[in-house]
A protein has these predicted regions:
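N-terminal positively charged helical leader segments and presequences
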Residues: 1-88
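Glycine/charged-rich beta-loop-alpha catalytic/anionic-binding loops adjacent to active sites
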Residues: 18-21, 108-116, 229-238
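RNA substrate-binding interface of SAM-dependent RNA methyltransferases
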Residues: 35, 101-102, 107-197
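Short beta->alpha connector loops at strand-helix junctions that form conserved
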Residues: 52, 76-77, 119, 145-146, ...
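Short, hinge-like loop/turn segments at secondary-structure boundaries
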Residues: 67-68, 92-93, 159-163, 207-210
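Structured adenosyl-cofactor binding patch, chiefly the S-adenosyl-L-methionine
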Residues: 95, 133-137, 151-153, 158-164, ...
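Active-site/ligand-binding-proximal alpha/beta "capping" segment
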Residues: 190-242
């Protein structure tokens, strides 16, 4: 089989998916590396799997499994693999996938007991890490509220380490509509706030029922008007001298606190 070069039209089209405009236009995105590709294959969203000869020696069962499942598997040159990959050392394994996000109503229809709701999250690495944490704690969904980063951004996909394909993810631009819909579903809305009236260490009763956690933007935190709409504002106790925690760390602490209470009921 001849390897496709970086000039092949299929390779060129796939490389264009590194751009947000092309992802929006096609409804497709790239998943890079064995973890993400394996998770994508499990969901049946892969349209084509590009692999280099180098990757074929390392990930042969994964590639063979994809082919057996009817996925188009395509050998590409090492140069083409470098173009397809977004990391310095390209893994040589890149899948073209259909978008993963679902409507907010679909997430709420599953009667979730734990949701992560990052508001206006801007940094794709943080978004991917938060999605990975949500997956690890067994959350039922992630709702990217407001003007949020595209979860199909390559950096977000890589940071999620496959979790993007495990957890339902919704995007909804109108924050007020998100809060209304979550409340209407009978879910308690908690906002993280440095001066929250509830200490996380004393919040077990609140955490026992269905909960949606609001997390603020990396640079500006949670808009006070949004925090005011939550049922409660919760502070993470800081015993040392750090002024605050970054978004992913705060999310991990709060989501794990919820999971601990819900799993020990």
């Amino acid at each position: 089989v001849d390897a496709l070069s970086e000039h092949n039209p299929r390779v060129v089209s796939a490389v264009k998916l590194q751009r947000a405009a092309q992802r929006r236009k096609t409804g497709q995105f790239l998943a890079e590396g064995a973890n993400s590709v394996a998770a994508a294959l499990e969901t049946g969203r892969v349209r084509e799997l590009f692999y280099s000869m180098h990757a074929a020696t390392r990930e042969n069962p994964l590639i063979a499994g994809a082919a057996a499942a009817g996925v188009r598997t395509t050998l590409v040159s090492e140069r083409a693999a470098e173009h397809l990959g977004e990391t310095v050392t390209a893994p040589g394994l890149v899948a073209v996938c259909d978008h993963i996000d679902v409507p907010l109503a679909d997430v709420l229809a599953e009667r979730p007991t734990l949701l992560a709701v990052p508001v206006e999250i801007a940094e794709p690495g943080n978004a991917g890490t938060l999605i990975r944490v949500a997956d690890a704690v067994g959350a039922n969904g992630v709702v990217l509220a407001g003007d949020a980063v595209d979860p199909h951004n390559g950096k977000c996909v890589r940071a999620s380490a496959g979790s993007l394909f495990h957890v339902p993810i919704a995007r909804h631009r109108d924050i007020g509509e998100v809060l209304d819909a979550v409340a209407a579903a009978g879910i308690t809305v908690l906002a993280t706030a440095a001066k929250g009236e509830v200490d996380l260490d004393e919040a077990d009763e609140l955490l026992a029922g269905p909960v949606a956690w609001l997390f603020g933007n990396e640079a500006h935190g949670l808009d006070p008007a949004v925090a005011a709409r939550a049922d409660h504002r919760v502070r993470i106790p800081i015993h040392g001298r750090a002024e605050s925690l970054n978004l992913a760390a705060a999310a991990a602490i709060c989501l794990y606190a919820s999971a601990r209470v819900q799993h020990t009921k």
